[in-house]
Amino acid sequence: MNRVATILLNRNLPDVTERLYEHLARFDGDLTDIFVVEAGSDVELLSRYTTWHANSDEVVRRGLRYGRGMNYGLSQLVKEGKFGEYDAFFLLTNDTEFNEGPTLAPLLKVLDDHGRVGILAPCSERWGERLLLHREPTKYFWFIHNNAYLLRRAFVEAVCDMEEPDVMGFLFDGTNFRGYGAEHELIAKAYANDWAAAITSQVWARENESHLLEKADQIKTEGYEDNLKIYVAEGRRWMRKKYGFNSHWSMQQYVKCFYDRFFEYYPEFSQYKV
């Protein structure tokens, strides 16, 4: 049995999804099983590697986005009795790109070396965080904006809703549809439950935004600028309603409190603090 379940999220971009699938199968096929979630894709635009096709009227109209999509995939693994077979889950949007070579082997090495890391993200060459990873290639952070997370199963089990695994609340809060601030909430849950969130430069990843810029109509979403405005506006309303926070800064400070407390309990990891 492979150690990792990789979940790829696709909406009407089969060629893009298949390239990523084949990259992972080529370089990491001995470590991962790959599952493709179709987020309301048109039948003629399904990937040939499709595992599950979410095709309710609402999903066909709006898609799933990252949070609901990953909830869907993880919930399916639970319902099919496969969830407990894996050590970790690699959650990817199909516009994620990696360098030629293995991705999961070095990430799993980091996860094995850092026993309290529950969330691990490869670094991006566009991130300022890369400047903090010269001497120590892996550091623990209180903010990681990414569409490529490797999650330890023990962490997921500590914070997920195993009693009612579904698209709206298994791991991510599905009421935050586009996901602005969702990474804050997930990382806060990690540190509040004695798990760390880390970025590593052992693997590099990037998001190919050209698909949203050039194929918004095919994906059936708003154009890049409109999508960004709605993403922020919806997320700020969600933060206000759920937490009473009026700004992104307040949410960050909320997470930072749990982050600092983690190192009070685990001073042996202080070398990984930023």
Residue ranges of model-derived segments:
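Aromatic-glycine-rich donor-binding/catalytic loop that engages nucleotide-sugar donors
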Residues: L151-Y180, K189-W195
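Active-site-proximal specificity loops/subdomain of glycosyltransferases
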Residues: E44-Y86
